[in-house]
Amino acid sequence: MVAAIVVASVIILTQCFSNHENDSGTSIMVEVSATENEFDKIMDRCCEVMEKRIQLFCEDEPGLVKAKFSIKRTNDNKRIRIDFKNVELGHDQVARVLNLLQSQGCLQFYETYTFNELSDCFYKANVKLAEKDNPNLEADFKFLYEGPLFDLLKHSFNQIAPGKYEAERTACVGKAKAIDTLAINQMLIETRDLFPHDLKLAWTVEPEIVDDSEVLGLIALKLSPDNKCALNGEAISDARLEYSSYNGEPEILIMMNNEGAKSWQRITGNNIGRQIAIVFDGYVYFYPVVTSEIPNGRATISGGNLTTEEAINIVNILKAGMLPVPVTVVE
């Protein structure tokens, strides 16, 4: 079996191998492409992170606790070879290993906007797109239901009086079918100048099923004054799998270092009654309402139909740290 993965600046090749009559296993080859002045640093960091991730994977995987593997640079010094010796990984195990290797492991916490705060921006964007499609458009069309953007991105409104509606005060600014997200992304790029400069939009990680269609939420993230997230994975000291006392579903408990805990206390204290979004590798996993200041440097990732296997993978990725380059899979 041979599979190929293109990794932004990394190519991963996996194959089952058999070098000797009684010697078989699974081999993973990683090729790194970087500028000369940072090449060694990237290679060393990739080796370090991958070794930690695979070690944690073996510890959690039945039958692999004592599995032997090696990680080393090839002779040309441009690739990293990972060998599982005398162990042929099953299809599901290979998929898990590739997921561990291709995930950059980028954890971020964001303050958020609400749809109530942005509804005028979305209305103007919808009108601009509608006028582009039809320059002679009448101005009295029903903006809540019509127009290129609103035909695909459905918003939530509360009725506050007969015939009068108010945009919901939620960080989820709309929901759309998964198949429509690329078209919506393009529309929002075309109308970017109508939105706040510190707004960043991100989709939820797992779809909900509505009328047999996969539907994702679009979450309004608010950038810090330096155009970054409010807090990132560098604040994390540990992570572990737990199960909710409320519904028994898996969740990830995150513990922060001293500096991270202080920042988390400030962030939660400044956002009581608002939502904080927890983003992993670009997708929103959870955006809970802050009910009180959190002084103990702890946070929980849950929801999004998170499975135990996915939770274990994320815990292992967080424990091992980020890869220096993002990873994407190509058939």
Regions found by a protein language model. Name each.
Residues 2-12:
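Hydrophobic membrane-insertion alpha-helices, especially the h-region
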Residues 29-289, 295, 299:
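Non-transmembrane, solvent-exposed regions of membrane trafficking/translocation machinery
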Residues 19-28:
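Membrane-proximal juxtamembrane linkers immediately C-terminal to transmembrane helices
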Residues 298-331:
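Extended, hydrophilic extramembrane loops/domains of integral membrane proteins
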